[in-house]
């Protein structure tokens, strides 16, 4: 079942008709429980009886549920589906009655978690008291995604605090399933708790930082791993300064996973730690990293050791060759000078498209723009190079011949050529911009068509538009995107008689 109240209302009808809870609700999905909770109370008009009631309450079972739940101690046992409906009922007395029966039904524990943030104080207090009696650490792990979801609600902090207390007191391995949960919010919670409680060694934290795809987890685990190493050094356990083998092994166990991680945050932390480990020379291997943050950390480490990253970049870029990493080109632009522009210009004809694109981006970063030379790069076969060249030319777009740019909008041109041409034409004002936008309002390319239509709708006549220009009126009429009043207003602003 999905996570909206409409599907929750449909599930409520199925439960009222006798369907099993697992059949009507995706019990493993926290969004499904939240949807059921809202869907049970979703009101729809009853045109026959002229009443507004949830759809499930119009069934025979729905009409009998209230009496069954409030019928006293001798009331007959209810199926889990009916109890689920009672736990989400719009009337607080029925929710409260359902809570007392649900406490002994583990399959209804998720709805007891939901009721801990109930808007009615008596129901909320009963739910919290009962949940504190039945929830254990294993159940908290199983329901953690739902617990964190409810914890973000008003009055929802109780469930997260309860789960945290249970997990802090549980054995360290209890958290293990949460480290690989599909929900990154759950993983963040688990690693934060593990770091606070010291459940993971520096090596385990480093492997987690290298493995996880979430940048928050990468940073948290990498920082904690390195902090753990520093603490060991301070307490004399690692013995790195004295050259102890145990200390070297400890750093290897932490640094190698970090340096080989896919995530930039983890690699950056590992590179920065090379200085403390006395291995600053290894940072040179990361000067050409694909991530800017890793390159910056590598430059810092080398400079602290007396190295010259700029000389390394100049040497590598001057040598060129197919093995030149694209990150080295970006690194030259990041710490180079305008005098390095010729090295970058030479790389705009490199055989590797990524190197050419980084070279063009580097020229833009150094604020070096030769319009004639940059214009030639608009015909590069690589879309990335064309995109970077267009961005570099954007500040001086009005220096380009608009008729030449208009011809590049033709549908037979490669897409990157058409996109770059429209980007540069749209940087103009007045008639040039309006002509380009109207030319593409029915373009087969969805994104180009959308951008063109947005440009038409935002167009205003500027000082360079001749007053009373008939072409403006014709273009606005062709666009067919504006209501009559707006067209009339634009024409009046352009000095056209209407």
Cite the ranges covered by each PLM segment.
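HEAT/HEAT-like alpha-solenoid repeats
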Residues: 76, 107-109, 122, 142-154, ...
């Amino acid at each position: 079942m999905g996570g909206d109240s409409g599907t929750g209302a449909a599930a409520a009808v199925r439960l009222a008709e006798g369907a099993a809870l697992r059949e009507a609700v995706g019990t493993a999905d926290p969004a499904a429980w939240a949807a059921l909770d809202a869907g049970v109370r979703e009101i729809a008009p009853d045109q026959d009886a002229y009443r507004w009631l949830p759809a499930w309450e119009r069934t025979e079972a729905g009409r009998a549920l209230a009496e069954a739940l409030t019928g006293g101690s001798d009331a007959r046992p209810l199926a889990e589906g009916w109890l689920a409906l009672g736990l989400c009922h719009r009337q607080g007395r029925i929710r409260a009655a359902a809570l007392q029966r649900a406490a002994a039904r583990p399959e209804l524990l998720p709805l007891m978690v939901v009721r801990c943030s109930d808007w009615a104080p008596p129901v909320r207090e009963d739910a919290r008291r009962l949940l504190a009696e039945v929830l254990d650490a294993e159940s908290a792990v199983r329901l953690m995604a739902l617990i964190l979801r409810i914890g973000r609600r008003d009055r929802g902090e109780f469930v997260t605090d309860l789960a945290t207390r249970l997990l802090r007191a549980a054995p360290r391995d209890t958290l293990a399933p949460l480290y690989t949960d599909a929900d990154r919010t759950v993983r963040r919670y688990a690693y934060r708790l593990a770091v606070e409680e010291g459940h993971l060694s520096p090596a385990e934290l480093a492997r987690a930082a290298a493995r996880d795809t979430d940048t928050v987890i990468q940073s948290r685990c990498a920082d904690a791993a390195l902090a753990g190493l520093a603490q060991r050094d301070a307490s004399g356990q690692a013995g790195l300064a004295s050259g102890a083998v145990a200390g070297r092994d400890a750093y290897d166990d932490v640094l190698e996973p970090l340096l080989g991680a896919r995530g930039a945050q983890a690699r950056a932390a590992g590179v920065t730690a090379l200085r403390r480990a006395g291995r600053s020379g290894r940072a040179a291997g990361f000067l050409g990293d694909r991530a800017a943050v890793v390159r910056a950390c590598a430059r810092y480490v080398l400079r602290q050791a007396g190295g010259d990253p700029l000389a390394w970049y100049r040497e590598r870029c001057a040598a060129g060759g197919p093995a030149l990493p694209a990150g080295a080109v970006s690194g030259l632009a990041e710490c180079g000078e305008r005098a390095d522009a010729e090295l970058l210009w030479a790389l705009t004809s490199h055989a590797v498209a990524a190197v050419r694109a980084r070279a063009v981006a580097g020229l833009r970063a150094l604020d070096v723009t030769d319009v004639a030379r940059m214009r030639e790069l608009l015909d590069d076969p690589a879309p990335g190079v064309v995109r970077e060249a267009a961005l570099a030319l954007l500040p001086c777009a009005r220096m380009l011949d608009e008729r030449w740019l208009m011809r590049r909008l033709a549908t037979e041109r490669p897409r990157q050529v058409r996109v770059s041409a429209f980007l540069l034409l749209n940087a103009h004002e007045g008639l040039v911009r309006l002509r380009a936008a109207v030319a593409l309002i029915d373009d087969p390319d969805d994104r180009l068509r959308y951008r063109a239509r947005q440009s038409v709708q935002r167009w205003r006549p500027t000082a360079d538009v001749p007053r009373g220009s008939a072409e403006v009126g014709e273009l606005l009429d062709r666009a067919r995107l504006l209501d009559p009043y707006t067209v009339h207003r634009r024409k009046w602003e352009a000095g056209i008689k209407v």
